[in-house]
From Swiss-Prot:
This is Probable transcriptional regulatory protein FP0835. The keyword Metal-binding does not apply. Keywords: Cytoplasm, DNA-binding, Transcription, Transcription regulation. The keyword Chaperone does not apply. Coiled coil: none annotated. It comes from Flavobacterium psychrophilum (strain ATCC 49511 / DSM 21280 / CIP 103535 / JIP02/86). GO terms for cellular component: cytosol.
């Protein structure tokens, strides 16, 4: 198994555990998708993917419909996606994806978390290169052979395909998302969920006390309403 498999195994059950937080993130994704490509999922592949993800976290259908309707209102502010980079204690690189309607607020908040937890907020590009930006798709196993599927999808950008208890996961570079999404839909394969992740190229092992220092910063960052995802180079 490759790095995507190990990364997924390490993060399982750790992030997106709070349902309310998941709903908030999906809501923001819906707004950004509708503002970008319109409210019709059939004509908006990004919105189609978000709706699939809403089902994966059991978000009520009426919540999704309400969010789409709200997003079509020209008075509804769009969210800007901003990437923050820095270091936690003990040399652990931190990469933070945010979606904010107030850039100044978000910058000030993220900086304060680093300062309070003995971290250092970095400049653009300071740690992003340490992570591979990937896309992923979860589909039902339905008796499919992951190895055969991987061979079939290599030409569309797939790099790693493996099975777990929840189905089959497909990993590919960030830029292959649209190509693989289209191919799966063309084949009539149900997409249970999809998304993007940043996988650290190298991880660092820490002591329990050092892990606690890093987790303190990560938890503080994750509590912020503007934060969508936090990635790091700490071994899990």
């Amino acid at each position: 198994m490759g790095r995507a498999f190990e990364f997924r195994k390490g993060r399982k059950m750790k992030r997106w555990s709070a349902m309310a937080k998941a709903f908030t993130r999906i809501g923001k994704d819906i707004v950004m998708a509708v503002k970008e490509g319109g409210p019709n999922p059939e004509a908006n592949s990004r919105l189609r993917a978000v709706i699939q993800n809403s089902k994966a976290v059991n978000m009520p259908k009426e919540n999704v419909e309400r969010a789409i309707k709200k997003a079509t209102d020209k008075d509804t502010a769009n969210y800007k996606e901003i990437l923050f980079e820095g270091y936690a204690p003990h040399g652990i690189a931190i990469l933070i994806e945010t979606a904010s309607d107030n850039n100044n607020r978000t910058v000030a908040n993220i900086r304060s978390y680093f300062n309070k937890c003995n971290g250092t907020m970095g400049t653009q590009g300071s740690v992003e290169f340490m992570f591979d930006h990937t896309c992923n798709f979860r589909i039902p196993a339905n008796g499919m052979d992951p190895e055969e599927l991987e061979l079939e999808l290599i030409d569309f950008g797939a790099e790693e395909v493996f099975e777990d208890e929840d189905g089959i996961l497909i990993y590919a570079p960030f830029g292959s998302f649209g190509t693989i999404q289209k191919e799966l839909e063309t084949r009539g394969i149900e997409i249970l969920s999809s998304g993007f992740e940043r996988i650290p190229q190298i991880t660092k092992e820490l002591t329990e006390a050092q892990i606690a220092d890093v987790e303190k910063l990560i938890e503080k960052i994750e509590e912020d309403e503007d934060v969508m995802n936090v990635y790091h180079t700490m071994q899990e």
